[in-house]
Design a protein with these regions (language model features):
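Charge-dense, helix-prone N-terminal extensions
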Residues: 1-114
Length: 114
């Protein structure tokens, strides 16, 4: 069987940019590692990509009812770091992560923040 590889920051950014009318922003002047993905029209974030202590994290917005299901089903999905924990989740990006699920959650976050 093929060994699963970690998704990397560039792959996540590239996928986020496939969503219509989006752009990458680096809003934190003291932190060049963290990147937000935003809608061009309303400037709202739909993803926050962070590199903390050599670990990659992705924050996405989810429906609050779905958040509970995700957190109980996947140990790599936790309440969002430094954000509204009812609406946002952090995905710990490592080799255990389901790439298809990550892409679905990016799409949902994009739709929820339009």
């Amino acid at each position: 069987p093929l060994e699963k590889k970690d998704m990397n920051k560039e792959e996540i950014i590239k996928y986020c940019l496939t969503q219509e009318d989006t752009y990458k922003d680096c809003p934190f002047t003291d932190d060049f590692e963290s990147v937000t993905m935003k809608h061009k029209k309303n400037k709202k974030w739909f993803a926050l990509i962070m590199n903390v202590h050599n670990k990659l994290y992705l924050n996405v917005k989810t429906d609050p009812d779905y958040s509970d299901i995700l957190r109980s089903s996947y140990d790599y999905i936790i309440p969002a770091y430094h954000m509204n924990k009812e609406h946002w989740n952090t995905i710990i990006i490592d080799k255990n992560v389901d790439e298809t699920l990550v892409k679905e959650l990016i799409e949902q976050s994009y739709e929820l923040t339009k």
